[in-house]
Amino acid sequence: MAITKDDILEAVGAMSVMELNDLVKAFEEKFGVSAAAVAVAGPAAAGGAAAAEEQTEFTVTLKSAGANKVGVIKAVREITGLGLKEAKDLVDGAPKPVKEGVDKKTADELVKKLVEAGAEAEAK
């Protein structure tokens, strides 16, 4: 009769800590493995590796409304879907983020739209 997985689990469950320690050492010797925790690679150090990583999400920020505040408020409403008062408050409170988590192409289009309306904007 063969030993089943359940028999092994029952035997291991009945062992003391010292016996389990000896069992682990025996496994290491028999199979040439290590019970040490696997080291997970952390984030790359700042510098060359970080610079090589391309940013995929951008935040479009309104830096200032410029001279054409009404046009900028209209552009902000169009971009965000905010109501008139909320868009005006956002424009009045510049610098403020207008749209977050957008891709590079969308961010560039939104910045262009804000600049055409008379605002000073950037994507980061």
Curated annotation (Swiss-Prot):
Database matches in InterPro entries: Ribosomal_bL12, Ribosomal_bL12_C, Ribosomal_bL12_C/ClpS-like, Ribosomal_bL12_oligo, Ribosomal_bL12_oligo_N_sf
A Pfam family: Ribosomal_L12
GO biological process: translation
One GO CC term on file: cytosolic large ribosomal subunit
GO MF, one example: mRNA binding
Keywords for this protein: Ribonucleoprotein, Ribosomal protein
Highest taxon in the source lineage: Bacteria
Function noted in UniProt: Forms part of the ribosomal stalk which helps the ribosome interact with GTP-bound translation factors. Is thus essential for accurate translation.
Assembly notes: Homodimer. Part of the ribosomal stalk of the 50S ribosomal subunit. Forms a multimeric L10(L12)X complex, where L10 forms an elongated spine to which 2 to 4 L12 dimers bind in a sequential fashion. Binds GTP-bound translation factors.
Assigned protein family: Belongs to the bacterial ribosomal protein bL12 family.
Protein's UniProt name: Large ribosomal subunit protein bL12
Organism listed in the record: Ralstonia pickettii (strain 12J)
Gene responsible for this protein: rplL
